[in-house]
């Protein structure tokens, strides 16, 4: 995992507190090496079978690895978010949002072990439709659990 929890939380809080219009801090875990940053753009996307199948495939990788590693029962909730931010309309970027919470009113992003993250990233990077993968490192508050 890229860095220590304390430093990531400090940076995330600094960003979201300094710019009130920013409510998320995400870390890029992977970008397809064949795609340049300037090639990634918002794409028009619909909630159709093909897109949902892609989301389910990515989510299944994450959930399988969480189960295998024993982390599934340690996190309160995990969301896999499909972003229409890609090089073309048939591709997507995804955000991982595992959180830990005891009272639902507050939550911290789950700091998954490096080996678990590496397994997840490696498998997702093999999928031909994935242009980028991010990790939501925002606590609640200021962020909510879900993405709207």
Model region roles, listed by residue range:
Residues 1-148:
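ATP/NTP-dependent adenylation/nucleotidyl-transfer catalytic domains that generate, transfer
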């Amino acid at each position: 995992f890229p860095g220590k929890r304390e430093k990531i939380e400090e940076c995330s809080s600094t960003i979201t507190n300094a710019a009130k219009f920013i409510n998320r801090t995400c870390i890029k875990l992977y970008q397809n090496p064949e795609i340049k940053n300037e090639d990634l753009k918002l794409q028009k996307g619909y909630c159709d079978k093909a897109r949902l199948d892609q989301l389910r495939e990515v989510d299944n990788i994450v959930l399988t690895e969480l189960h295998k590693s024993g982390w599934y029962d340690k996190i309160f909730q995990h969301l896999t978010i499909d972003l229409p931010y890609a090089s073309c309309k048939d591709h997507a970027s995804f955000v991982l949002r595992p959180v830990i919470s005891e009272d639902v009113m507050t939550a911290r992003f789950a700091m998954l072990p490096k080996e678990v993250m590496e397994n997840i990233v490696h498998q997702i990077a093999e999928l031909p439709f994935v242009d980028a993968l991010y990790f939501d490192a925002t606590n609640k508050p200021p962020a909510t659990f879900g993405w709207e």
